[in-house]
Amino acid sequence: MSDIHEHKILILDFGSQYTQLIARRIREIGVYCELWAWDVTEAQIREFAPNGIILAGGPESVTADNSPRAPEYVFNAGVPVLGICYGMQTMSEQLGGKVIQGVGEGEFGYAQIEMLAESALFKGIEDAVSSDGKSLLDVWMSHGDKVSAIPAGFVAVAKTDTCPFAAMSCEEKRFYGVQFHPEVTHTRQGMRMLSHFALDICGCAANWKPSSIIEDAIERLKKQVGDDEVILGLSGGVDSSVVAMLLHRAIGKKLTCVFVDNGLLRLNEAKQVMEMFGDHFGLNIVHVDAENRFLDALKGEADPEAKRKIIGRVFVEIFDEEAKKCVNAKWLAQGTIYPDVIESAGSATGKAHVIKSHHNVGGLPDDMELGLVEPLRELFKDEVRKIGLELGLPYNMLYRHPFPGPGLGVRVLGEVKKEYCDLLRRADAIFIEELHKADLYNKVSQAFTVFLPVRSVGVMGDGRKYDWVVSLRAVETIDFMTAHWAHLPYDFLGRVSNRIINEVDGISRVVYDISGKPPATIEWE
């Protein structure tokens, strides 16, 4: 088996919103990489032994005092270095070039760069040709400052009308700087540039692929837990499902999954989880039907934050009770993924993987004394999904829209009651079914129904009814940080509304939420 960590790229984070995207792109190319804060030590870099280093972008100005710098060792390590945006500016400044503050002439958004010289980074890449025969590339810019003089030994590789050094290189040392963002899709050939860097310039092999990651994870799990028993909280979500499948492959019946049905799940979800993991895949699952316990604890509580805390607390109590019954369990498995690890590390702490444990399960009692197993902690969400497919999990489960941890507890506004949850489940199932039928489900990023605790007058036949209101919500987003409401066709919305009002006795009115984020959040609570 090839070592999936043998070749690797180190990405130093200077605070750009795009940094995780760079890491995901390098992984997509098939090369392992890690994301560390910019202030790492020489010893840490030596220990990691990267085949190449990428200096990412950042919001600071190189011209400001105390702005972040790459460790000097980066330029003496003998490996290729690629500086992106701020990374190019700090590389230039640190190696003897010059950076000036942009005054009113920064470049933000689409730009076309003109190639001035050949470079290994841009080999065979062009989007268009200018009238005087120069290669042109479509790129995405986001910078105020710019390099005004490049270091000795470097050549200008590309320019724009306002930026004389849109790209620079020192081919001898294999140092490259680009003022644009190759990692975003708006830079049309960005993936080819990053691929040139990782595979051709750094000489990495593309060993990082789902089948190899699975083999590696199973080997490591066997080594870590040996013949011990492991306990896992299985929610039916992507992360815990993939952890369950990996552990099942590695240790079989020594894994006990605890599935807690809190009464706040989607229609038939508990049944589907039990059928898939229990009957189909043959996992050892303890099914705890705790609907009444959760609803009793939530009685009379209308505050969203308090509801979240109650749901979390009751889950921990139940999980603790079940874990104590597994007297031989020595390990607790969790679905921690790489963005959780990065978040926990923060900047200015050195190496990004020296972290505080990220407890997805939340505040589990210390007296459990279980070791922690986190087989997904190196993976991004899109990688977890690809691994899930390779492990045989169904596509529609892995690529389902996000569902909040507290479930319908935060989609029923105000106090949560069984009657409200049952109505909401059925209304939501109709909305999702119709989205699939109309081939719209995968065109929106997230869609769901919200129960509003208000009554509205309706007419059914000759009679009047006074029943509840639900709101449909559908958004389009890239990163869930900002979102637009989805412009679903009116006839589609009309069809969904008619079905819900006619088929779900107790709902008399359906509205559509047209709020963006900001100012509204995606979920209502």
Curated annotation (Swiss-Prot):
Catalyzes the synthesis of GMP from XMP. It comes from the Bacteria. This is GMP synthase [glutamine-hydrolyzing]. Residues 208-400 form the GMPS ATP-PPase domain. Residues 8-207 form the Glutamine amidotransferase type-1 domain. The gene is guaA. Pathway: Purine metabolism; GMP biosynthesis; GMP from XMP (L-Gln route): step 1/1. HAMAP family: GMP_synthase. It holds the Pfam family GMP_synt_C. Gene3D superfamilies: 3.30.300.10, 3.40.50.880, HUPs (3.40.50.620). The active site is at residues 85, 181, 183. One of its GO terms (cellular component) is cytosol. The keyword Nucleus does not apply.
